[in-house]
């Protein structure tokens, strides 16, 4: 009997000992199999191996990394985010080499989404970023059924510096919709693609709408300086759409001779044209625009007053401070938000208090306007307000808060990573875009005051 008990003790003790020790990391066999599958581009097989792991198993970092890379290749960024969190715990510094492709995957995986608004959002953000490595995705966008997607794709190709070598962008000059053709003209002319000049001359000769103005502008960029006369003349034509196009172009070209025409636009009978003129004076960027913008602050149209306030802030002239401070008491809340933005652009962080009040307004569009205004500063109190708006019940304030954080010089990456899990897909895409903005200049962003 004693001998039997001794034998049982010897046999059982190893199992008892093993039960008390942590589960060992998964052995090399599974890792080698996953590596081989990955090297053969069998990404589904890699994930099949990954998900076959028992829940109690401790996976090795190389295996997690293989699964992470496979989810990116398959366009499944939500799964990749979970794996990233396993690779880089929240108490460790982020790895840009992993976080950047993860953020980009959120955008590229939605460019073919069934919902048009999602595709528009993805391409709009890609246009803001201008990433050369997305050329294939951007050129695919030129074939989308949505006019806005095609337009944003053309813009993005130009911003990415790809216009000069993009055959699909040249073909977009023949698109059925003017907005796409205009975007293609702008991108190609900025890339100094000279051989489109005959096309541009023909458009300028035959079109009597806004498209002709953009053709003139493209010709001007390509060296035909006399086109400035045609653009200036278009700013006084009967069609308000043509006048707006001309004023917008003149503001961007920033020619000293254009000031009188831009100033005259502030007195246009159409409020939409006056607003365009106010915005163009902000683009023009010269102190000589203060006079007409000051007049615009008294306009009957709240939209005109709001754009004028933003433009005054963009000029960066501190003498405009009293004008903007007075506008924070405007009857229209959107105008107040624009005045706050203008003050913040002038470095007046006391305006953050006013932004905080607007961020509590019952109208979600006003809360969104407050978030937009706060993009003009990296002050820590501004970040706190934006962080609160990230919890808003309505998507619009959350969306603008996420975009504002992308422009912040404060350390906001942890906040943006959290928003990658938002319930609204458009906000997740905006968070990805803001993360890419943050990763672009991690060391040169201004410090929070």
Predicted segments with their positions:
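N-terminal leader/linker segments that initiate helical-solenoid repeat arrays
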Residues: 12-102, 446-449
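Core register positions within helices of long alpha-helical scaffolds
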Residues: 70, 94-98, 125-128, 156, ...
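Bacterial N-terminal signal peptides
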Residues: 2-14
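Amphipathic alpha-helical scaffolding segments comprising HEAT/armadillo-like alpha-solenoid repeats
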Residues: 47-48, 61-65, 77-82, 97-111, ...
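Short inter-helical turns and helix N-cap capping residues of alpha-solenoid HEAT/ARM repeat scaffolds
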Residues: 114-115, 145-146, 176-177, 207-208, ...
């Amino acid at each position: 009997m004693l001998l039997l008990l001794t034998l049982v003790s010897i046999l059982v003790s190893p199992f008892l000992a093993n039960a008390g020790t942590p589960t060992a990391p998964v052995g090399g066999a599974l890792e080698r199999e996953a590596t081989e599958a990955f090297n053969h581009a069998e990404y589904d097989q890699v994930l099949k191996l990954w998900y076959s792991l028992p829940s109690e198993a401790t996976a090795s970092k190389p295996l997690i990394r293989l699964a992470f890379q496979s989810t990116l290749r398959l366009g499944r960024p939500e799964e990749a985010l979970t794996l990233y969190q396993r690779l880089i715990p929240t108490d460790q510094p982020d790895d840009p080499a992993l976080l950047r492709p993860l953020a980009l995957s959120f955008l590229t995986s939605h460019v073919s989404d069934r919902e048009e608004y999602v595709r528009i959002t993805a391409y709009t953000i890609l246009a803001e970023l201008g990433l050369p490595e997305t050329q294939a995705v951007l050129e695919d966008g030129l074939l989308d059924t949505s006019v806005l997607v095609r337009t944003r794709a053309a813009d993005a190709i130009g911003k990415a510096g790809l216009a000069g070598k993009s055959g699909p962008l040249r073909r977009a000059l023949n698109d059925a919709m003017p907005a796409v053709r205009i975007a293609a003209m702008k991108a190609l002319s900025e890339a100094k693609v000279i051989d489109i000049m005959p096309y541009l001359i023909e458009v300028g000769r035959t079109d009597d709408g806004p498209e002709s103005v953009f053709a003139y502008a493209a010709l001007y960029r390509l060296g035909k300086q006399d086109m400035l006369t045609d653009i200036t003349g278009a700013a006084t034509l009967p069609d308000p759409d043509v006048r707006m196009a001309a004023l917008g172009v003149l503001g961007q070209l920033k020619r000293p001779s254009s000031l009188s025409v831009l100033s005259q636009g502030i007195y246009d009978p159409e409020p939409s044209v006056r607003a365009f003129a106010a915005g163009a004076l902000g683009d023009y960027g010269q102190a000589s625009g203060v006079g007409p913008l000051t007049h615009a602050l008294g306009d009957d149209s709240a939209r005109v007053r709001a754009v004028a306030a933003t433009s005054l802030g963009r000029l960066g002239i501190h003498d405009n401070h009293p004008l903007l401070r007075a506008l924070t008491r405007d009857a229209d809340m959107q105008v107040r938000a624009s005045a706050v933005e203008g003050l913040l652009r002038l470095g007046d962080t006391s305006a953050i208090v006013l932004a905080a009040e607007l961020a509590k307004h019952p109208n979600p569009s006003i809360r969104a306007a407050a978030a937009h205004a706060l993009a003009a500063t990296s002050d820590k109190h501004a970040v706190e307000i934006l962080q609160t708006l990230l919890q808003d019940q309505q998507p619009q304030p959350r969306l603008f808060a996420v975009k504002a954080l992308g422009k912040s010089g404060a350390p906001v990456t942890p906040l943006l990573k959290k928003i990658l899990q938002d319930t609204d897909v458009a906000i997740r895409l905006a968070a990805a875009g803001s993360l890419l903005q943050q990763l672009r200049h991690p060391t040169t962003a201004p410090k929070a005051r």
